């Protein structure tokens, strides 16, 4: 009577189990990403899809090295699916033909007014920024920025400073019209300053400082989705629009992809910088950087370069 499997058989079975345990979670992740199943805790998790795409390649290599062909087949499908959604962000896209003027736009989350105002003004000066959008904009931040000379560099503005994180602002080198502030009705109730910028030698451009609610907890996911859904769509048959700010979402979140589908282009994605992180890590945490800040431009606008 055989009461135990031979050592070689036990080792083979262990290798098979190991492969399936490694492949299955990434395959489910790929399914959630492709099917747009960003609900509940998956909303936060899917922000890290680029890292999981890298892991999926290692899992495929493991399955092939162990000669586990069925797990390897699933791992290959998973890697192709994830890399197919992520890798194009590192490749520059063909830009539309544009002969108009150059507009340099900068966006910054001021961290409830605690951001480095001096560095921000220096960036505006050094890069000759034409339009600046800010989020988490406070009265103290407004005063400090003006003391540092921002009111001279960008004299036209639509500002809504608030204590805390709900404030918003838009600064411009050129005159602005049709100014206003829109309030997100869910979650934190972040405000979004907007204006139509009169670009010399070009058509006017509607610019808005975007700041939907953050899905920082499960009970905030609904507010996050509602705020993203309420963002102004592109107007491909009308005037040019730009949304710039802290979207609290990555290109792996379906509400942001739906917004892009109205006629926007993600500027970083268009220039091959779509995998550059804009948030994290902070305060010594172990969270790797994710890309939640974006500049979305009308698809008729050519994007020449992006820096983070």
Regions found by a protein language model. Name each.
Residues 1-2, 36, 50, 176, ...:
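Residue-level marker of positions within ordered structural domains that often coincide
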Residues 2-148:
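N-terminal, active-site-proximal structural segment of metallo-dependent hydrolase catalytic domains
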Residues 105, 111-125, 134-308:
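Soluble catalytic domains of enzymes that build or remodel membrane lipids, polysaccharides, and related
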């Amino acid at each position: 009577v055989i009461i135990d499997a031979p050592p070689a058989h036990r080792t083979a079975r262990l290798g098979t189990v190991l492969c399936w345990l490694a492949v299955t979670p990434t395959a489910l992740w790929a399914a959630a990403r492709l099917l747009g199943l960003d609900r509940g805790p998956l909303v936060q998790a899917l922000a890290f899809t680029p890292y999981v795409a890298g892991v999926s390649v290692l899992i495929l290599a493991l399955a092939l090295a162990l000669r586990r062909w069925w797990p390897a087949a699933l791992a290959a499908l998973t890697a192709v699916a994830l890399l197919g959604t992520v890798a194009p962000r590192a490749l520059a896209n063909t830009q539309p033909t544009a002969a108009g003027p150059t507009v340099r736009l900068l966006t910054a989350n001021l961290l409830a007014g605690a951001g480095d105002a001096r560095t921000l003004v220096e960036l505006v000066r050094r890069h000759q920024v034409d339009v600046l959008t800010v989020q988490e904009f406070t009265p103290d931040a407004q005063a400090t920025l003006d003391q540092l000379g921002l009111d001279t560099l960008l004299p036209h503005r639509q500002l809504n400073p608030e204590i805390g994180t709900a404030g918003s602002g838009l600064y411009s080198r050129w005159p602005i019209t049709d100014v206003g502030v829109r309030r997100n009705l869910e979650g934190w109730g972040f405000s979004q300053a907007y204006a139509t910028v009169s670009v010399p030698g070009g058509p006017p451009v509607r610019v808005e400082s975007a700041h939907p609610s953050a899905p920082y907890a499960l009970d905030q996911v609904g507010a996050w989705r509602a705020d993203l859904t309420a963002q102004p769509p592109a107007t491909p048959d009308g005037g040019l629009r730009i949304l710039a700010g802290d979207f609290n979402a990555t290109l792996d979140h379906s509400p942001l992809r739906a917004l892009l589908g109205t006629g926007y282009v993600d500027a970083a994605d268009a220039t091959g910088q779509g995998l550059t992180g804009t948030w994290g890590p902070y305060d010594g945490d172990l969270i790797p950087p994710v890309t939640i800040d974006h500049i979305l431009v009308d698809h008729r606008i050519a994007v020449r370069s992006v820096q983070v």
